[in-house]
Amino acid sequence: MIRLLIPIVSVVLMLVSCRAKTVDGMPIELKEQLIGLSGAHNARQLGGYRVGDKKIKSGLLLRTATLSGLSREDSILLCEKYNVQCIYDFRGKDESLSAPDVIPGKARYQSMALSFTGDGKRADTKFGSQAQMIEALLQHADHPSVQAMCTRLYEIIFFDKSSQQVYREFFTDLMTLNPENGAVLWHCAQGKDRAGCASAMLLAALGANRELIMADFALSKSYYDPIASRIKTDTDAQKNVINTLISANPELFGKALDKIDAEYGSMLNYLTECIGVTPEMMNILRERYLE
């Protein structure tokens, strides 16, 4: 069995030497975005990012990997520091059952099961855990369907009709929440693909440019590269699986954004036409989460 995740403290120590990316002259550093959870990987916030002449309020918009390993101290932190009021879980049902979230305090849990099938139908992985899924994908890395996932992953997430419906539900529910009542947290298995696309959409709705959206996505690569480098691969096809499904692939993500621009003109048009996020909704989100 592949061991997907090395201890979080080890990952954090490896990140000390990561070079900061710069957006509009401002450094975007992973260590500045991390929220200090010991039992959840890639746990960070959108707070502090500059959006035009404003910035995203700190401590209100959190993105993480699965919460199944939260410690007691993590739960206390999420309750007392962030007052998390709602958790959105983008994992499939089998994934969620295999590794149920630890729900901090009285936070509301909302399943947002998202398909990777690309066929317009909701589906759940039958692998159970993320580790089992990756092991199976490595064993069949040369299969055309696996390679298609590695080359079209973000395109599938953004353009699959059932995925769009899930994100529509996410934004619809998000609009009902008052940030004065606490933070919202969304996650998938590793907090980089399904959750990463949610973050990209939310950043765009808040007025972020493509450069910031790409920089935020790339922080997942900075986080997971030390883990991916420890997994042995024997073929180029397996390396492709690791680089995309264990780490993150900004180049592939950028191609999906290119397709959005080509087909819809902009991410904002995509949000309105495909996700149902109207300009009025965007204005409300900006009033709530920018300062």
Question: PLM features: residue spans?
Answer:
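Bacterial N-terminal signal peptides
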Residues: 6-14
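Cys-dependent protein tyrosine phosphatase-like superfamily
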Residues: 18-185, 197-291
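Ser/Thr-glycine-rich phosphate-binding loops at phosphate-binding pockets of nucleotides
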Residues: 190, 194-195
